[in-house]
Amino acid sequence: MANERSKLAFKKTFPVFKRFLQSKDLALVVFVIAILAIIIVPLPPFVLDFLLTISIALSVLIILIGLYIDKPTDFSAFPTLLLIVTLYRLALNVATTRMILTQGYKGPSAVSDIITAFGEFSVSGNYVIGAIIFSILVLVNLLVVTNGSTRVTEVRARFALDAMPGKQMAIDADLNSGLIDDKEAKKRRAALSQEADFYGAMDGASKFVKGDAIASIIITLINIIGGFLVGVFQRDMSLSFSASTFTILTIGDGLVGQIPALIIATATGIVATRTTQNEEEDFASKLITQLTNKSKTLVIVGAILLLFATIPGLPTFSLAFVGTLFLFIAWLISREGKDGLLTKLENYLSQKFGLDLSEKPHSSKIKPHTPTTRAKTQEELKREEEQAIDEVLKIEFLELALGYQLISLADMKQGGDLLERIRGIRKKIASDYGFLMPQIRIRDNLQLPPTHYEIKLKGIVIGEGMVMPDKFLAMNTGFVNKEIEGIPTKEPAFGMDALWIETKNKEEAIIQGYTIIDPSTVIATHTSELVKKYAEDFITKDEVKSLLERLAKDYPTIVEESKKIPTGAIRSVLQALLHEKIPIKDMLTILETITDIAPLVQNDVNILTEQVRARLSRVITNAFKSEDGRLKFLTFSTDSEQFLLNKLRENGTSKSLLLNVGELQKLIEVVSEEAMKVLQKGIAPVILIVEPNLRKALSNQMEQARIDVIVLSHAELDPNSNFEALGTIHINF
């Protein structure tokens, strides 16, 4: 009957226990409540031993996690965990103090076995030695480890916050150039925010460690003095026996608490001083590699130890053995070849003693086939010559030529990521503009200067630049606190002033507010901007066919109707849109407008384009919005706009402005001046809104004058969007 009741009780309680283990939040809450209970409730010795063991285990676990993480933010819970563990250890100090003062007179076994072991075994029962060891541990923890960890976390927190604007702009630059997508940008921004929050929290959490070390000293003094008074005045113990008993117990308690505290403080320093590691090499491997990287240093250490071994009075054997070991390791490292240290040792033992220690694969009895060579026939030689000529005559649609020092940027085996960034450009262009740019042919060109590159469209150079593959480009975007040294240059995509800086100065440049760009990104960004500039050239008839085929999968009827319209007319409309930076992503609206209007206007491209633009009002408005979601624009005064309307002249279906030299000069000067004022406010691009009849003619005039202004008409604005008028342009013609 009793067994059945036990089984029934177990059956009822086990699901509750299982849910408790599975609920991480509940387990943490119970742990914190248990810490508070430890402070209030007296504990028996075996429970106290159990809790002290957990304290030691937690400290070892934390320092091991700190050694194995790749970067500090992988242990983002560390600051909070540090607070909880510190509170737990202080609660144990209260519990052990209560136990020592109330039960210490009965003997060490009545308090705690762990405290007794540390008080008697670790210091041989000598409370003077124990006090000295405890003092050393406290001083090392407080003055060395804790102070260093606190200072490091303060500096890392300040540097992380100072570098945030530069890193944020670098993310925005990668996003704008198509190197990353929105998802990756959000991921990087979240990581950046997490890093700043982590170091900010670490700055405060490090103070817990320092306070814990100070509290340990005070608690130890209280235990010794309080225990002595309790033993003499309340328990009638002799002065010497009371001092010996309570001092040993207190020193044991101090060591049990101070060793985990020292480990936690060391873990804090390790986490705070860790940098991001190479994914292919962990911290321990990298540490050993760097320590044994130069055989010369090991030789010097070995020679110094051997020299010390010859000095009378010093331990000859120990010094000579360690010195010889250093020389042997240095000799192994200095041997030729790229094998690791263990492989070199294995090869040495194999050669020295005739041992075969390597793991060799089973040899095959089948001999490899050796191909025979023969003379090529005349037909084969002729065919190869024709193929070579065809290769020379072939014109690549889009080509990137690199100087020989830049080839490594496109070689993935050498760590180059230019190909990956070019692929990112294609995705970004397709996402933003609605067409798929052709593959970029990347080739080396020995005729170029070593660090130069050229971007060609149909064999014609449309852009060129220079990058230094072993340096970084630092750009001052207006947030620089202090200028740094570097080689002055011009950023090729936008013509901004920049500096080429050494790799070792990268972190300093970020801290000072520079936007840092690697060489591959410089080339990729330049390529991206040129593709946007010449976007209309990529709309071939084949590309139009591909766009229609993709649209036909979802909207076959409209594509079937569009077959009545000449492909050339559709292509011309798409090119006209891209020429003025209007995306063609909404092919459905574009094609519907063309099929509706084309029969009425005899496929006139100018009229079709303006009608399509009016239908794309939401797309156009969204394309030129500022970051705050507003379309910010300039307008002409009523009399200025009316004057320009009166100057319109029709040439068939197109219109142009018929202005004399003076009128044209005034128009260009005033618009340029107003556009510059807008750009100086950090607003780009500059939008100018005019009457629909005036838009195309004025846009052509601005393009001829090379004024970077987007001219829109009132008909192309989405009425549901937010707008902000920046000013009115008045021209005294």
From Swiss-Prot:
Keywords: Bacterial flagellum biogenesis, Bacterial flagellum protein export, Cell membrane, Membrane, Protein transport, Transmembrane, Transmembrane helix, Transport
Keyword Protein biosynthesis recorded: no
Alphabetical list of Pfam families matching this protein: FHIPEP
Gene3D superfamilies according to UniProt: FHIPEP family, domain 1, FHIPEP family, domain 3, FHIPEP family, domain 4
Transmembrane segments: 28-48, 49-69, 125-145, 213-233, 246-266, 291-311, 313-333
Localization in the cell: Cell membrane
Positions of the UniProt region annotated as Disordered: 360-381
Stated family: Belongs to the FHIPEP (flagella/HR/invasion proteins export pore) family.
Name assigned to this protein: Flagellar biosynthesis protein FlhA
Source organism (scientific name): Helicobacter pylori (strain ATCC 700392 / 26695)
